Curated annotation (Swiss-Prot):
GO MF entries: DNA binding
Taxon lineage: Bacteria, Bacillati, Bacillota, Bacilli, Bacillales
A matching Pfam family: HrcA
The organism of origin for this protein: Bacillus velezensis (strain DSM 23117 / BGSC 10A6 / LMG 26770 / FZB42) (Bacillus amyloliquefaciens subsp. plantarum)
UniProt record similarity statement: Belongs to the HrcA family.
Keywords, ordered alphabetically: Repressor, Stress response, Transcription, Transcription regulation
Entry function: Negative regulator of class I heat shock genes (grpE-dnaK-dnaJ and groELS operons). Prevents heat-shock induction of these operons.
InterPro entries from the UniProt entry: GAF-like_dom_sf, HrcA, HrcA_C, WH-like_DNA-bd_sf, WH_DNA-bd_sf, WHTH_transcript_rep_HrcA_IDD
Name this protein carries in UniProt: Heat-inducible transcription repressor HrcA
Gene3D superfamilies: 3.30.450.40, Heat-inducible transcription repressor hrca homolog, domain 3 (3.30.390.60), Winged helix-like DNA-binding domain superfamily/Winged helix DNA-binding domain (1.10.10.10)
NCBIfam families for this protein: hrcA (TIGR00331)
GO BP, sorted A to Z: negative regulation of DNA-templated transcription
Length: 343
């Protein structure tokens, strides 16, 4: 159990190191307004903190830097949110100012603005298409035996799918088909369309379209549930180059190589808990990230988690600021998506 004096010294060391990236010595601490102890007391307390594993000495300096254990204690017990500036809030609110809300643009903009505000790398995992509901479908003939189905979801996502008809289909039948699909499938989750067609829509096709069986077969391949593609949006991929810890080219190259592998990036989100989650240094699953911290946050529709945001930075990350930004952005995203999904 750390004493109040040790807690204060640890907090000041970490806050100073976050800002300066320079080892912190007793002389630096003695100049801090909140530190009122003698230099001898500071040195003794620092020695105890080092012995306990919360700070460590670097080879090139007499000062101390936080250890992973120190950062973990700081995050778990000493972290307090910071008040965001008007500039911060204006930038965040600009994400949602578009009159026409489009899922992909909004998520992409969130990634970019978070990277701008933190100067770290941001990754946003957007909702999968299966989380969307069909709002409208149009079918546009492009050849006698081919058409394009235009699917619009409740979140503004637009997807084109090709329909290959086995024989010439009458335009009047296509019009009937569109009316039936819109009437029976509007509001149905995208990954349930195929099932609904063969359980329910088939009855209406049989009643109203002569060669319904050939059209039904065409719909089977068109609306077959695709794999749930999880879409990633990045901001500031090379921001790590601005951090002193990553002036080592080999270190940053291995990290950038990891970020380019989509499946590896997706794994970063797999163990994310609801809300805010923080992994520090070797707590991360990849060796390439042992000098990094990863902060993830989830956003929801009502209480259902539909996406996540990750910020990757050095272990010397400004945790308070990043957590405050993520809380604000995920709250706004949750409200925006909830209003869309409830329409």
């Amino acid at each position: 159990m750390l004493t109040n004096r040790q807690l204060l010294i640890l907090q000041v060391i970490i806050n100073d190191f976050i800002q300066s990236a320079q080892p912190v010595g007793s002389r630096t601490l003695s100049k801090k307004d909140e530190i009122t102890f003698s230099s001898a007391t500071i040195r003794n307390e620092m020695a105890d903190l080092e012995e306990l594993g919360f700070i460590e000495k670097t080879h090139s300096s007499s000062g101390r830097i936080p250890s992973e254990k120190g950062y973990r204690y700081y995050v778990d017990h000493l972290l307090s949110p910071v008040k965001l500036t008007k500039t911060d809030l204006d930038l965040i609110h600009s994400i949602f100012k578009e009159k026409i809300f489009e899922l992909e643009k909004t998520v992409q903009k969130s990634a970019q603005i978070l990277s701008d505000l933190t100067n770290y790398t941001s990754i946003v995992l957007g909702p999968t298409l299966s989380e969307n509901y069909l709002k409208q479908i149009q079918i546009v003939p492009i050849q006698p035996d081919k058409a394009v189905a235009i699917l619009v979801t409740n979140t503004g996502h637009v997807e084109n799918r090709t329909i290959n008809f086995p024989a010439k289909v009458d335009l009047a039948d296509i019009e009937k088909l569109v009316n039936i699909l819109n009437d029976r499938l509007a509001g149905v989750p995208m990954d349930e369309l195929n099932e609904r067609i063969f359980k329910e829509v088939v009855t209406y096709l049989r009643q109203h379209i002569a060669n319904y069986d050939s059209i039904l077969e065409s719909l089977r391949s068109t609306f077959h549930p695709a794999a749930h593609v999880e879409k990633l949006f990045f901001g500031g991929k090379i921001n790590m180059l601005n951090q002193p810890e990553f002036h080592d080219i080999e270190r940053v190259r291995s990290l950038l190589s990891l970020i380019e592998k989509e499946q590896d990036v997706l794994k970063l989100f797999q163990s994310s808990k609801a809300g805010i989650s923080i992994k520090i240094g070797k707590e991360n699953d990849y060796e390439e990230m042992e000098n990094c911290s990863l902060i993830t946050a989830t956003y929801t529709v009502d209480t259902k988690q539909i996406g996540s945001i990750a910020i990757i930075g050095p272990t010397r990350m400004n945790y308070s600021r990043v957590v405050s930004l993520l809380q604000h952005v995920t709250s706004d995203l949750s409200k925006a998506f909830t209003s869309l999904y409830d329409e």
